Amino acid sequence: MTNQKQTTHFGFKSVDWNEKEKKVAEVFHSVAKNYDRMNDLMSLGIHHLWKRYTIELSHVRPGQSVLDLAGGSGDLTRLLSQKVGDSGQVVLADINAAMLHVGRDRLLDEGLFKNIRYVQGNAQCLPFADNSFHCITMGFGLRNVTDKDEALQSMYRVCKPGGKLMVLEFSTPVFPGLKPVYDWYSFNILPKIGKFVANDEASYQYLAESIRMHPDQETLKAMIERVGFEDCHYHNLSGGIVALHIAYKY
């Protein structure tokens, strides 16, 4: 169990362990209705390429069960549902009710409903039976989790033997000279876009800070392996601005 008195980071701030979950919930409740538009603006649409690359490497097949954790507005779920077909199932899970509603409404509007289920749940204590999913994806959600080790343990528990974990997340730029440019953009431009488009500068300031506080590629690889996943490797995308970690449960 998590120490009730322990502190953790919320962006660059130190907060009580249990307070972070509440604060993150407030951020995503605030950004939910503008989430897709902001993603397009902030990444110049490149996030769609990162997600499609993730799906290409998933090798998900018809009839399989997939968990899209922190699935938010449903980008990965949409693509995964096409892969598993009517005989499979994708569970879109998110801790935030506002984000879950955005994803559900969006996918229903697109006529996608036969093989998608929606669950509100905490990544640290997933409400699924052991060995439930052939593949677990988590796109841009892990950095917002309070106890990442506990969440990864929970993912390992619900992953089937022979199954795969895929974590797509902002990471640490590896190209020389890219990091200062990226930092300048993140802290000077990104919050201003949030203020102009969504009238919410503070939430996007947090998002920039949360990226900087997230473990780098090698640290996250070690964390994933520590809970039992094997053969963990990662792909740096856009010079390491984003990394896709892939690991297996044997």
Swiss-Prot record:
Its EC number is 2.1.1.163, 2.1.1.201. It catalyses: a 2-demethylmenaquinol + S-adenosyl-L-methionine = a menaquinol + S-adenosyl-L-homocysteine + H(+); a 2-methoxy-6-(all-trans-polyprenyl)benzene-1,4-diol + S-adenosyl-L-methionine = a 5-methoxy-2-methyl-3-(all-trans-polyprenyl)benzene-1,4-diol + S-adenosyl-L-homocysteine + H(+). Pathway: Quinol/quinone metabolism; menaquinone biosynthesis; menaquinol from 1,4-dihydroxy-2-naphthoate: step 2/2; Cofactor biosynthesis; ubiquinone biosynthesis. S-adenosyl-L-methionine binds at S73, D94, N122, A123. One of its GO terms (molecular function) is demethylmenaquinone methyltransferase activity. InterPro entries: SAM-dependent_MTases_sf, UbiE/COQ5_MeTrFase, UbiE/COQ5_MeTrFase_CS. It comes from the Bacteria. Keywords: Menaquinone biosynthesis, Methyltransferase, S-adenosyl-L-methionine, Transferase, Ubiquinone biosynthesis. GO terms for biological process: aerobic respiration; menaquinone biosynthetic process; methylation. Belongs to the class I-like SAM-binding methyltransferase superfamily. MenG/UbiE family. Methyltransferase required for the conversion of demethylmenaquinol (DMKH2) to menaquinol (MKH2) and the conversion of 2-polyprenyl-6-methoxy-1,4-benzoquinol (DDMQH2) to 2-polyprenyl-3-methyl-6-methoxy-1,4-benzoquinol (DMQH2). This is Ubiquinone/menaquinone biosynthesis C-methyltransferase UbiE. It comes from Legionella pneumophila (strain Paris). The gene is ubiE.
